[in-house]
């Protein structure tokens, strides 16, 4: 029997809770939304970077809710993210870029959709993947904005003069201050008349005879009824795990790190605001460095089987040559729930799964899971007892999360053996049977989109060929001779060489014109609405 969805109840605030509320406001028109989030419960977020999918939330426009991108950036101190710079992962002292998105120059898919002959060419020539415009912007501390003040036919296909151009398309993302972003989104969401915010804590629930949730009992004694509940309560998993027979599937046999030590570094007058997340492999894990307009959000993710929190702090302070003040000590378990949707309860964010924050997986999947649900499963009437419907969604999310877990494990496919942690993390036994199978396939042919489990038929998956290739290239896993043979078999070697030479020249011209990161934030961000968005071909 179908249930009409009139009231949606979201348990938990933070990035997960408020982005979920924002998604429902943007893409539904009828149901009322109640958000229950206690100010007494601290936000777990430690500074985040996003993928391009978060852009849709900030840039989405309709009559329900509007967010102005410039206003968001100015008030939260967020910055643009063009990619990730990996240091010390393959060899100590060596770095490689992992830019977001495809090249700004559009190419035809040949011999079939998803065949990335440009990246394959880099493998065939043993080249670092730094030819893309995004990579060069990263390495030169520039952003994809420029002014056309003179004739510039090499890039000015529209023959514009005295124009401000924004050629981001959807190839960049954001670096966020978790607390400021959560507060900003909260303010925007509760402005809407469909939303009711309750500062309280869930202590119990009441179920219907069919095991669906009927209402929540709050610490204050209030009873909050709902037709559909979304668990954004983080690692507590108040609804999705505690109210249903729902097992947690651990990834600890494949991913070793289990602790995080976040800290901040305030910007100085001469601090360069990078346009990339820097992830630096350390002795017993890795460190993130997320640049904001006012500070850096940093942290050491490590395995406490090999180092204590005190020694971890000493290692970071020695490497950075400064004293740090850890914001908190976060102990976590990598893994996912067996079921992401149970009856009339859906989970997202940390409530559903978590892996180490190496590729902006957490906030991406928060957005992706809700978007996929809204696109493929949501209606005003849902049968919460239709096991096949719910099972299909759960199978899809299981597939995606297991795919992401294998992608993270791939980062540890390293020749490093300098500590016990790296000897263990890089050992073959840490790879799933599926990842071993893929690596064997890629010894004989280059990767294809069909290789990834999470290839859902929508635009939100993201962790596909592009990202896998960049890690495979950076970690020097793919074979030069296989790449060369394949390009020759499709008669693409010479064609790609010409394209490679053209792109090098084109990229050099583009990067020369673009604003330096710091200059843009200081002088141009306030004029963001004056920039015309263009897609350069």
Model-derived features: positions:
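Short FAD-binding loop at a beta-strand-to-alpha-helix junction that anchors the flavin cofactor
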Residues: 340-358
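Dinucleotide-binding Rossmann-like beta1-alpha1 core, especially the glycine-rich loop
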Residues: 46-148
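Conserved FAD/dinucleotide-binding core of flavoprotein oxidoreductases
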Residues: 281-333, 353-364, 379-382, 386
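N-terminal Rossmann-like FAD-binding beta1-loop-alpha1 element of flavoenzymes
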Residues: 6-31
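Glycine-rich FAD pyrophosphate-binding loop
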Residues: 25-46
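Long, low-complexity C-terminal extensions of enzymes
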Residues: 376-537
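Predominantly flavin-linked oxidoreductase catalytic cores and closely associated redox partners
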Residues: 163-312, 370
């Amino acid at each position: 029997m179908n249930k009409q969805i009139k009231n949606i109840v979201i348990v938990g605030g933070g990035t997960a809770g408020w982005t979920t509320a924002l998604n429902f406001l943007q893409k539904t028109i009828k149901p009322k939304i109640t958000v229950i989030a206690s100010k007494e419960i601290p936000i777990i977020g430690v500074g985040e970077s996003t993928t391009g999918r978060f852009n849709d939330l900030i840039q989405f426009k309709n009559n329900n809710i509007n967010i102005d991108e410039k206003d968001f950036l100015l008030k939260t101190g967020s910055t643009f993210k063009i990619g990730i710079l990996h240091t010390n992962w393959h060899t100590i002292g060596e770095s490689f870029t992992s830019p977001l998105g495809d090249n700004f120059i559009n190419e035809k898919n040949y011999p079939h959709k998803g065949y990335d002959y440009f990246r394959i060419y880099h493998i065939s020539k043993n080249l670092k993947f730094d030819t893309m415009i995004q990579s060069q912007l990263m390495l030169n501390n520039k952003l994809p904005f420029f002014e056309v003040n003179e004739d510039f036919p090499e890039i000015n296909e529209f023959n514009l003069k005295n124009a401000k151009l924004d050629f981001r398309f959807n190839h960049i993302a954001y670096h966020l201050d978790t607390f400021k972003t959560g507060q900003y989104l909260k303010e925007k969401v509760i402005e809407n008349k469909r939303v009711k915010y309750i500062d309280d804590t869930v202590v119990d629930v009441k179920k219907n005879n069919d095991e669906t949730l009927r209402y929540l009992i709050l610490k204050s004694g209030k009873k909050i009824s709902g037709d559909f509940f979304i668990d954004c309560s983080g690692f507590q998993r108040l609804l999705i795990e505690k109210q249903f027979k729902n097992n947690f599937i651990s990834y600890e046999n494949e991913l070793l790190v289990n602790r995080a030590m976040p800290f901040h570094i305030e910007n100085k007058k001469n601090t360069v605001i990078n346009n990339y997340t820097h992830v630096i492999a350390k002795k017993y894990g890795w460190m993130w460095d997320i640049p904001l307009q006012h500070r850096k959000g940093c942290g050491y993710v490590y395995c406490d089987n090999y180092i204590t929190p005190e020694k971890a702090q000493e290692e970071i302070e020695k490497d950075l040559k400064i004293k740090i003040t850890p914001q908190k000590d976060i102990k976590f378990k990598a893994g996912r729930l067996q079921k992401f949707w149970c009856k009339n309860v859906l989970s997202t964010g940390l409530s559903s799964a978590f892996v180490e924050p190496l590729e902006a997986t957490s906030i991406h999947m928060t957005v992706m899971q809700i978007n996929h649900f809204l696109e493929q499963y949501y209606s005003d009437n849902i049968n919460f007892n239709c096991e096949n419907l719910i099972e299909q969604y759960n199978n899809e999310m299981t597939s995606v999360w297991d795919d992401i877990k294998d992608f993270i494990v791939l980062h540890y496919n390293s020749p490093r053996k300098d500590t016990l942690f790296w000897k263990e993390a890089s050992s073959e036994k840490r790879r799933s049977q599926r990842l071993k199978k893929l690596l064997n396939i890629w010894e004989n042919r280059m990767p294809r989109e069909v290789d990834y489990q999470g290839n859902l038929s929508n635009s939100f998956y993201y962790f596909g060929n592009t990202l896998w290739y960049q890690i495979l290239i950076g970690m020097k896993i793919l074979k030069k001779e296989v790449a060369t043979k394949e390009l020759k078999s499709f008669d693409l070697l010479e064609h790609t060489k010409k394209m490679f030479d053209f792109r090098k020249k084109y990229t050099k011209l583009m990067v020369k014109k673009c604003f330096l990161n710091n200059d843009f934030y200081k002088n141009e961000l306030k004029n963001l609405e004056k920039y015309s968005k263009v897609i350069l071909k």
